[in-house]
Amino acid sequence: MATAASNPYSILSSSSLVHADSAVMQQGSPFRNPQKLLQSDYLQGIPSNGHPLGHHWVTSLSDANPWSSLASSPLDQQDIKPGREDLQLGAIIHHRSPHVSHHSPHNNHPNTWGASPVHNSSGQPINVYSQPGFTVSGMLDHGGLTPPPPSGTTQSLHPVLREATDHGDLGSHHCHDHSDEETPTSDELEQFAKLFKQRRIKLGFTQADVGLALGTLYGNVFSQTTICRFEALQLSFKNMCKLKPLLNKWLEEADSSTGSPTSIDKIAAQGRKRKKRTSIEVSVKGVLETHFLKCPKPAALEISSLADSLQLEKEVVRVWFCNRRQKEKRMTPPGDPQQHEIYSHSVKTDTSCNEL
């Protein structure tokens, strides 16, 4: 009694709370929220595939519980179910969706499913677990181990993945086309390089002539080094394959022009045609040597008459005398009389040969 008298507010507060709670309960028992009533009655009629819906679907409405604001909290965002395309993509790669096969620890909270059931445009409720190929346990409807038929796989893919698949098919087709192209082997390139070198030398063309001729004929100028490396098989396989058809065309044209002066002149004009080395017989060379000892610098008339007698070109005779004089200078030390001077003193020289 003393305790009650010392604290008169305790009795008042406890009694008032009891009466307040009882009043609320008495008011809440006959009255139900219209929205709550309709949704609860409606949810009871929805088939749930053998899994009855818990009471938290009804009691977690925004007007039934002040804690319904947690529906927009980060905890609720972690339990957002994946879309149709994500679930179907997971079925294709043989992975079970973690949101379907494992329950989140927050599912026991009464406010986890605070939002109302999702409805489509026709007004029918959409079951989250009724995705094609999935059940509530995350297994596949058609057996649980094999993927869906391949006919629907491409259509169910994401547009980006579907486009990537199409590009992959096109890429494989292009690779198949490139593989069909005729590519010479290393043995064929080696044989062609050997044959090309033999034919080029036989026709009398230098490597530089071939490079310039390719530039004039086909618009691709190649240096002498490139042709040399091709013949020596020192280029890469890719460059050898590129250069082979050009050299083959040039070789065919050069072979077809054999015996035709006009074609030969045309090819010679395209490149620097190397002059053939003049070979003089030993008997002819002896006659020229004897004439050189008599007159190292013959006149133009003497060169012409000597060329006619030896059946040589005038230019060949003139060049031979020039080269012979240069050789005489290299062989004779400075200050010593040259050989033609010694010979001129011992033998009477021809008066028509004069020093110029």
Curated annotation (Swiss-Prot):
InterPro entries, alphabetized: HD, Homeobox_CS, Homeodomain-like_sf, Lambda_DNA-bd_dom_sf, POU, POU_dom, POU_domain_TF, TF_POU_3
Entry keyword set: Activator, Developmental protein, DNA-binding, Homeobox, Nucleus, Transcription, Transcription regulation
Source taxon at top rank: Eukaryota
Compositional bias (Basic residues): 97-106
Residue ranges of the annotated DNA-binding region, renumbered to this chain: 273-332
Domain annotation POU-specific: ranges: 181-255
Annotated compartments: Nucleus
Biased composition (Basic and acidic residues): 160-181
GO MF annotation list: DNA-binding transcription factor activity, RNA polymerase II-specific; RNA polymerase II cis-regulatory region sequence-specific DNA binding
Pfam family, one: Pou
Role description: Transcriptional activator. Induces neural-specific gene expression to act as a key regulator of neural differentiation.
Name this polypeptide is given: POU domain, class 3, transcription factor 4-B
